[in-house]
Every structure is written in structure tokens, then in C-alpha cells.
Design a protein with these regions (language model features):
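Extracytoplasmic metal-acquisition and chelation regions
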Residues: 1-265
Length: 265
């Protein structure tokens, strides 16, 4: 979310990313450095949908900054601004890392992120009224850049045969461009596969084309085994752009994902 915050806020705000892009946001713990950064913050921008529930509430509570408490103008969740996929499932921990309110990994969908940018501009305008025009202009510019790139991304992925993901973390991008999800390496979210489960997945995909994608914090072992079994390309990709990225950096991040999905063609 740091890239989007920079795209909308520009030089009117200093943006600090609390979680490095190569870290699993499901597994982080609150750290003193987070609390220091939050103590003087005017606004927290989170993905939401309970993705950061294991660490962000604790970090905010211990920062002793009432401005950024949930429910205050200084707390903003991207997930609250858009329609989520995978919503409405039972809150049953035996089913793995489930999110009953919806899949939180919406930031790989550039169209939803353009919608979030508009909402973020309004929140920034509320906190910093003199900058309202600038925030809205920047959000519209980001949305326009997404619109300009959509036809090229769509052409690139037309006819893409599909992908196996380690986790359901790129489904927003797949849904946006109609790329089939052929399977997930995890049998349930957050649970690594057994050898038998991996063999069954490979057997069901024999004779098909596709690509295998996984994040830096996910074990490469199972993706590489599946890659050898199916003779498919396997590629490691971060779910987030670099920590210092801005709007163009986010768009380049989507370029990399589109290129990777097209590898299966």
C-alpha cells in the first residue's frame, strides 16, 4: 500500500512502509520499530480484511496515538472501499488461513486499486484540507494510467492457459483478466502440501499448459517439484512492489505479474 499512498499523497506526506514486501503479512508480529513509526503518524493505510490482524492492532494499541485507532479518520482500510472476492465463508480455523470477510489480497487488481486511490484521496483531503485538490488530482492521474494500460495487459493475457498459485493471493488479478486458476499448492490456505497431495495435483494437470507462481516467503520446494513433473515454468514473484515504489512502480509491478502469467502460453 506504500506505493499507492505515495502516488496519491505525493510530496505532501512522508510514507513509511511497516511490512517489507518479501514478508508474509499473515505471519508478522508487532515490533517496537512499528510502534515508533505509528506514534507520530497522521494516517495508517492498511489492506484490511483481517490480513494484518496478527500484528497491526497490537502495534497501533501500543503506539498510544489515538489519531490512528480503527474508527478514526486516521485509520484507512483498502478492503473497505471495494467489493471483495471469497467473502462469506465460515470462520473455521481447520480450513486454514481463511478470511470470512473476503480475500484481502486485492492490491494485485489495478482496477480495484484505482478505486482505492480515489477513496484514499478523500480521506487525505479530510485530514489535510489544503491538499485536497492535489490529492484528488493525483488519484485521478493514477486511475487514468491504469485505464491506459488495461488494453495492453488484456491483450497480453488473452488466451493464457492458466496458473497454479501457492496460495490464493493473486486471484484478483486472475479474475480481472480472465486467467484460469488451475489449482493451489496449499491444500487449504496456510497449510503446506503433503507429497501425496502434490502428486494428485500434478496428475490432474498432466497434458495441460500453464505456469506456477509463488511468493518469496513461500517454500520453493513444492513449486519446483510440480514444475519438473509438468514441464511448466515456475517463477517467484513478490506480492507487493518494492518498499520505496510509487505509482509507476506499482504499474511496473503489475507488468511483471502479467508477463509471468503469460509464460504459460
Amino acid at each position: 500500500m506504500g506505493a499507492l499512498a505515495r502516488a496519491v499523497a505525493g510530496d505532501r506526506a512522508k510514507v513509511k512502509v511497516l511490512a517489507a514486501p518479501d514478508r508474509d503479512l499473515h505471519r508478522l508480529q508487532a515490533k517496537p520499530s512499528m510502534m515508533r513509526d505509528l506514534r507520530g503518524a497522521e494516517l495508517v493505510v492498511a489492506l484490511g480484511a483481517e490480513l494484518e490482524s496478527g500484528w497491526l492492532p497490537a502495534a497501533i494499541a501500543n503506539a498510544a496515538n489515538p489519531k490512528v485507532l480503527p474508527g478514526q479518520p486516521g485509520y484507512f482500510e483498502a478492503a473497505a472501499q471495494v467489493t471483495l472476492l471469497d467473502a462469506g465463508g465460515p470462520a473455521d480455523r481447520s480450513r486454514g488461513d481463511v478470511h470470512p470477510v473476503g480475500n484481502p489480497h486485492l492490491d494485485l487488481d489495478p482496477v480495484r486499486m484505482a478505486q482505492v486511490a480515489q477513496a484514499l484521496a478523500e480521506r487525505l483531503a479530510l485530514i489535510d484540507p489544503p491538499g485536497a485538490t492535489d490529492y484528488r488530482r493525483r488519484a485521478q492521474s493514477f486511475a487514468d494510467q491504469v485505464d491506459q494500460r488495461m488494453p495492453g495487459w488484456s491483450r497480453r493475457l488473452a488466451g493464457a492457459p492458466g496458473v497454479v498459485l501457492y496460495h490464493r493471493d493473486a486471484i484478483y488479478l486472475l479474475e480481472r483478466f480472465g486467467v484460469p486458476l488451475l489449482g493451489t499448492i496449499e491444500p487449504v490456505p496456510g497449510v503446506p502440501p503433503t507429497g501425496r497431495q502434490l502428486s494428485d495435483l500434478a496428475a490432474g494437470l498432466k497434458g495441460r499448459s500453464g505456469v506456477i507462481l509463488y511468493a518469496p516467503y513461500q517454500s520453493p520446494q513444492a513449486p519446483q517439484v510440480l514444475s519438473r513433473e509438468l514441464a511448466w515454468p515456475a517463477k517467484q514473484l513478490p506480492l507487493e512492489p518494492p518498499a520505496d515504489a510509487d505509482g509507476p512502480g506499482y504499474l511496473s509491478h503489475i507488468d511483471r505479474w502479467v508477463d509471468a502469467l503469460a509464460l504459460g502460453s
